Amino acid sequence: MPGIKVFGETVLRGSVRVSGAKNATTKLLVASLLSDQRTILKNVPNIEDVRQTVDLCRVLGAIVEWDQQAQVIEIHTPRILLSKVPPQFSCVNRIPILLLGALLRRCPYGIFVPILGGDAIGPRTLHFHLEGLKKLGAEIVISDEGYWASAPNGLVGAHITLPYPSVGATENLILASVGAQGRTIIKNAALEVEIIDLIVFLQKAGMEITTDNDKTIEIFGCQDFYSVEHSIIPDKIEAASFGMAAVVSQGRIFVEQARHEHMIPFLKVLRSIGGGFSVHENGIEFFYDKPLKGGVLLETDVHPGFITDWQQPFAVLLSQSEGCSVIHETVHENRLGYLKGLVKMGAHCDLFHECLSAKSCRYSTGNHPHSAVIHGPTPLQATDLVIPDLRAGFAYVMAALITEGGASWIENTEMLDRGYTDWRGKLERLGAKVLARDSVSVYV
């Protein structure tokens, strides 16, 4: 299992350039499969999830040229070669499920996707995806092996209301609807900035898509697609991650390309606990300004709320903030398990199955530990940790950097490769001492 040794008592200083958004890039690659036209994507992050998606597209028939130095991908899929996704792709992440929507136009007699993998943060049901596709006219068969979708008579526009504004379901239904006949209206849709980026991409390809402020997306199906050149938005999760690392280490980092308009809920909560930042034309500078004050309720939500991927690194900040703070995770029912690692380091965290908030969430009646109370500030001690998922991984690295002496062993670091371009190199250039397993003996 890949691992690193992270030394504590580290103050991070310098600048870092945020990469293109993981959650936009992978979906845009899938969207390129909608037609046989050429697509050029710029600002492409060199991360494992993108590499896996590129490999998946190639297996399906795409011709891909990736200039990693220039961060540019050119992709062209003259025809779809496979109707069944190889199982090795579904065990890594959840991207393959979007092929049900994206490929039904080109593979009307069926596309099969095996049971999915991804982060261990809860089941993340596909019910919203599948029911929405059925309303568009798709025939769905579910087995122990996976999901089979077909539309031998083609897809037809429909009115769809999602029970919950699921990001994945919204993306899947957009991809299916652009190839359907007539008009589709998706109500209670997710409108994260990555989804808006997908919509902009599809508009460039000739699609007629509009959105409004009440979470409604209107799509007119089209059979003619244009070639597209598109620059991917910066990754708001990576930007916030390095911002939190700056504050918790009592340092100062300028995060180049960070867009404050994509991060307003995060910046608001960061300011409320005393974290410092200043917005510039080409990025955001984050810095330690004064002792952090807790006593906040951190409640995750869909856009325009505080997104769930910011929650785990923010817990490290709360462990160093004076007072009692509450986390209420409303997006994924099993995303607080990583707190065991912080407790092992000395943090005071208590898990609860109840909704510790003025409002109840969809997990209020289940037996899910989705709320937590964190007391701070608490000195953290170096220890051995195993990363359970991508964002928890960055939280563990942040925590290890501020331990009082010693060094922490952190294993399963390939999780970080999924979502952070050159994360180790960036941290080292900011002053961190991060050693791979094969070089540790030099420093022991």
Swiss-Prot record:
Q: Reaction catalysed? A: phosphoenolpyruvate + UDP-N-acetyl-alpha-D-glucosamine = UDP-N-acetyl-3-O-(1-carboxyvinyl)-alpha-D-glucosamine + phosphate
Task: Give the molecular function GO annotations.
Answer: UDP-N-acetylglucosamine 1-carboxyvinyltransferase activity
Instruction: State the EC number(s).
Output: 2.5.1.7
Q: Which residues form the active site?
A: D119 (proton donor)
Tell me the keywords, alphabetical order: Cell cycle, Cell division, Cell shape, Cell wall biogenesis/degradation, Cytoplasm, Peptidoglycan synthesis, Transferase
Q: Which GO terms describe its cellular component?
A: cytoplasm
Tell me the domain of life. Bacteria
One GO BP annotation here?
peptidoglycan biosynthetic process
Binding locations of phosphoenolpyruvate = K22, N23
Q: Which residues bind UDP-N-acetyl-alpha-D-glucosamine?
A: R94, D309, V331
Which subcellular locations apply to this protein?
Cytoplasm
Pathway, per UniProt? Cell wall biogenesis; peptidoglycan biosynthesis
Name of the top EC class for this enzyme? transferase
InterPro entries listed in its UniProt record: Enolpyruvate_Tfrase_dom, Enolpyruvate_Tfrase_sf, MurA_subfamily, RNA3'P_cycl/enolpyr_Trfase_a/b, UDP_GlcNAc_COvinyl_MurA
Tell me, what does this protein do in biology?
Cell wall formation. Adds enolpyruvyl to UDP-N-acetylglucosamine.
Q: Which family does it belong to?
A: Belongs to the EPSP synthase family. MurA subfamily.
- Protein name (Swiss-Prot/TrEMBL): UDP-N-acetylglucosamine 1-carboxyvinyltransferase
Question: Its encoding gene is what?
Answer: murA
